[in-house]
């Protein structure tokens, strides 16, 4: 009898919870419509995989890509709407958040065609790979719109868990297992430190979890200049630093880049930084409004260390993926300049513009690594010597993306860096911008060294890998070439396109 009553109570409680969740989704679902499209795509993938055979594999790619494109379309239709807070203050919708969501969706959309031939050649499980990519994308999108401490913690954990699984996707590869172990351990440690910082914010504000309410709580409790806020600032900086991977939080980056499947590295190298940058701008700018001098100093130190260490160590690398890992550490130092400048002097606009160009430059370079690696089985820099003689399109595309990463005119990377450094200079960050300029010159050296190898035509310098290079392993490699063409075009946009891009980015401020 007692068990029967308890069972009825459990059913009633479950029904109430379900009805409350349904009520929230019904009245607030329009605010997360792009995310709902991805959720529907995930469900559809699972249904097709459980009821289909190998002949339906192209449908899996089609559904994944279509759901991403539809989500981008939904975001564009919602552009310029009034900022709204939904789900009882957990989620905020505004142009600033949406442009970061757009960047994450763009990364995922380009990474899926980048992965098709790699998955077929390595015989990886397709459905799970696509599920993890879409779920990580979903976590990144929720992180961009997160408006309270709980969502800011749960959303990146969703992204991180999928990242751990993707990085160890090739289970038989010892390097992949090692990379995943390091990634998982350091990710768990950084998450615990992040939660520790959140607990100090929660306690100091009198039990508030929404970002703006935390500010009001700190004013009411007079704790905005307390030692607890300093502890919270340091802890949260360390936690977010793991996602951004600036020095000295970069130890996991080279190993994960080298050991993980190349399409996974391409995906993680851009999406994690976009999502973490969106979260960092809101966390530092709102709850730590009264500690702006302190977090500016912290980020300046991280930016300087990242730009110097990342670019100097990249010179010594022999693996293409490890070189790009250290290059990305230097690149995040440039992005941090935009975070420090903030609203004033178009700091966020310059950061968003540079990140858009960085996505195209980085993914274009990784498309070349995927294509070359599938045909030669190597990512050693020396093995690229003479590639121009066998595949001029691949060599020229690689050269353009690398030159744009280095910031040479008239490519997109040059104008992106120029605008970013100019905003930093106007904000009085003279030393930081000077370091950025010097390290950019250093980066040009190792990019040009690779381009020289690509373009060499002397027989004695052409490696056996290039001599035995085959144009295509499969019937067609159009999917990789499609991503590469899009990225190369975006990486070589002349300066005439900068003004409309910056104008759009300026509309995304809070």
Swiss-Prot record:
It is an enzyme of class 7 (translocase). Its EC number is 7.1.1.-. The chain crosses the membrane at residues 24-44, 57-77, 99-119, 124-144, 183-203, 227-247, 295-315, 323-343, 347-367, 395-415, 418-438, 484-504. Its main location: plastid. GO terms for cellular component: chloroplast thylakoid membrane. It is a multi-pass membrane protein. The keyword Plastid applies. Keywords: Chloroplast, Membrane, NAD, NADP, Plastid, Plastoquinone, Quinone, Thylakoid, Translocase, Transmembrane, Transmembrane helix, Transport. NDH shuttles electrons from NAD(P)H:plastoquinone, via FMN and iron-sulfur (Fe-S) centers, to quinones in the photosynthetic chain and possibly in a chloroplast respiratory chain. The immediate electron acceptor for the enzyme in this species is believed to be plastoquinone. Couples the redox reaction to proton translocation, and thus conserves the redox energy in a proton gradient. Belongs to the complex I subunit 2 family. This is NAD(P)H-quinone oxidoreductase subunit 2 A, chloroplastic. It comes from Calycanthus floridus var. glaucus (Eastern sweetshrub).
